[in-house]
Amino acid sequence: SAKRMGFDIPYSEEQINIASNKIIASQNVENGYVRPVAWRGSEMMAISAQQTKIHVAIATWEWGSYFDPKLKVEGIKLNISNWRRPAPNTIPWDTKASGLYMICTLSKHEAEKQGYTDSLMLDHEGNVAEATGANVFFKDKNGELHTPTPDSFLDGITRRTVIGIAKSKNIKVHERKIKPEELSNFVGCFLTGTAAEVTPVSCIAENQFKVCDTIIDLNESYQTLVRKKKAA
């Protein structure tokens, strides 16, 4: 992301990892979130920012669950956002740039006003893209998974991890374009993300889904993988 944004980060990956671990230890965080951020300084206050200094900060805090734990069992409800993911030739879509989250915030706020937990976003062509802060998967009647091709949104680490888990269980995973009108054909749906982890979805607008055994099993396998404890 930094390279795509033209940021020359003044620290190595190892230095940032060491600093992150120190902060986690000093804050006594056991189940939380780590967020490193980088930004340009104020040396140039104009569109051009070639001479600005790159700053880095790391924040961490205890964060048990991104969604209400009860909703993670029953499945969360999504509406379909009026805002769309931008076309890939209009913005560096494959970066963790804060500006890309503006439409996500607007979409989530509108969803919450309507009584939903989150919002499903479409891409510039009207295909299913992702939720406001997580990737999305669907399960069909044959037990196979379908997930949008990440060509206008981030291919999340959790997304790739879950795909790997699914394949290890001999579950077929199709990465493809998905039309909104296909949603009624699926029997299950879930989100994946660093904060969302594996979260079942009970409905998207008028489309209903079941929290099926496949989703529960994938979540349990994911939890086992990311919460491995070192032997004493």
Model-inferred region functions:
Residues D8-P10, S26-V37, F67-D68:
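Short secondary-structure capping/junction motifs at helix and strand boundaries
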Residues S1-Y11, Q15-K22, M45-A232:
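Helix-start/capping segments and mature chain N-termini
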Residues W39-M44:
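Short, internal active-site loops enriched in acidic
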